[in-house]
Regions:
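C-terminal catalytic histidine-bearing segment of alpha/beta-hydrolase fold enzymes
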Residues: 214-253
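Short amphipathic alpha-helix adjacent to the substrate-entry channel of hydrolases
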Residues: 82-101, 209
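Conserved alpha/beta-hydrolase "acid-adjacent" motif
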Residues: 197-206
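Short beta-strand/loop motif that positions the catalytic acidic residue
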Residues: 184, 190-192, 196
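N-terminal cap/lid segment of alpha/beta-hydrolase-fold proteins
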Residues: 1-64, 153
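Short beta-strand element of the alpha/beta-hydrolase
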Residues: 66-75
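Catalytic nucleophile-loop/oxyanion-hole region of alpha/beta-hydrolase
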Residues: 81-85, 101-130, 233-238
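Primarily recognizes the serine-hydrolase "nucleophile elbow" in alpha/beta-hydrolase
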Residues: 112, 116-185
C-alpha cells in the first residue's frame, strides 16, 4: 500500500478507493474501538503462534438476531486489503440491518482462519446477538476464493471438523479466477468487470453456468469497462450491486 493520508490511500491490485468511505470506516472503528475487534484464537494459541494475535474479526453490528455475513478482502494472499475490499461491504451490510464481520486473516493460512471465524461466530452467536443460521460468505479476489471454498459443504466440514455448522446460504464473490465446480457448492452470486486483467469475466461466467447446470442457484453480472478490485463500485456502472447481492442472499436463505 501507499499514501500519506486517507485521501491518498492506494492498495496494490485495487481501483476506485473512495476516500469518503475510508474516512467513514475509520470514524466507525474509532467510535466502536472498545468492542469492534473480536479475537478468534485463545491466548494459548496466540502464544504458540504470535501471528494469530493480528488475526480476528471486525464486527459491524446490525439488528439483534439478524443473520450474519463474513466479508473477506483480497490481496493475492500477500496482504489483506480490508479498507477497500471488506470493511466497506461490512459497513453497508450493517446499515441494511445485517450483522457483518470483516476477517483479518493470515495470508499463508487464510482458509484455516476463515474456518475458525465461522466456528467462532457459530459458537458465540447468542453472545454476539446474531442468528447462527442463514449466513453468507463474501469475498473479493483472493477473498472470493476463500468464500467459495468454505461455502462448499465438504470443505466446510474438512476445515472446521464440525458437522453441526450449517453450510452457508450464499456465496457472494467478486473478481476471482476460481473455477472449481462441485455439487456441494453453495448458491453463488458473482460480479466482475469486463476489463479485469487479473480475473477473466468469462472464467467466472463459465463457472456459474456449470453451477447452474448442477441445479445450484446463481446470478452473474459483468460490468462493462471496469477493472479489477472495484469494491462497492461507488460512482461506477457497478454501483448498487451490493443490494442485488443481498436480495440474492435473502432468496436463498
Amino acid at each position: 500500500w501507499s499514501g500519506e493520508t486517507l485521501e491518498d490511500l492506494r492498495l496494490v491490485w485495487y481501483n476506485y478507493i473512495d476516500p469518503d468511505k475510508t474516512v467513514e470506516i475509520c470514524n466507525y472503528l474509532k467510535a466502536h474501538a472498545d468492542s469492534v475487534f473480536l479475537d478468534i484464537y485463545t491466548e494459548s494459541e496466540k502464544q504458540d503462534d504470535p501471528q494469530k494475535r493480528n488475526t480476528g474479526l471486525f464486527f459491524f453490528r446490525g439488528n439483534p438476531g439478524a443473520p450474519f455475513a463474513v466479508c473477506n478482502a483480497g490481496g493475492a494472499f500477500a496482504y489483506v486489503g480490508a479498507m477497500h475490499d471488506s470493511f466497506p461491504h461490512a459497513l453497508e451490510l450493517s446499515k441494511l440491518g445485517y450483522n457483518a464481520f470483516a476477517l483479518i486473516y493470515r495470508p499463508d493460512d487464510a482458509y484455516e482462519d476463515l474456518a475458525r471465524a465461522i466456528t467462532y461466530i457459530h459458537d458465540h452467536a447468542d453472545e454476539l446477538g446474531v442468528s447462527a443460521s442463514g449466513y453468507s460468505l463474501w469475498g473479493g479476489s483472493a477473498g472470493a476464493r476463500m468464500a467459495a471454498v468454505l461455502g462448499n459443504a465438504n470443505y466446510l466440514y474438512q476445515l472446521t471438523g464440525r458437522e453441526d455448522i450449517p453450510q452457508t446460504s450464499a456465496v457472494i464473490m467478486q473478481y476471482t479466477g476460481y473455477n472449481t465446480v462441485s455439487p456441494q457448492d453453495a448458491a453463488t452470486y458473482a460480479c466482475v468487470g469486463t476489463s479485469d486483467g487479473i480475473a477473466s469475466w468469462r472464467t467466472m461466467q463459465r463457472r456459474l453456468q456449470s453451477l447452474s447446470a448442477l441445479g445450484i442457484p446463481t446470478e452473474f453480472h459483468a460490468y462493462n469497462g471496469l477493472p479489477h478490485g472495484f469494491g462497492l463500485g461507488t460512482g461506477m456502472v457497478a454501483e448498487g450491486w451490493i443490494k442485488d447481492a443481498v436480495r440474492f442472499w435473502e432468496e436463498n436463505r
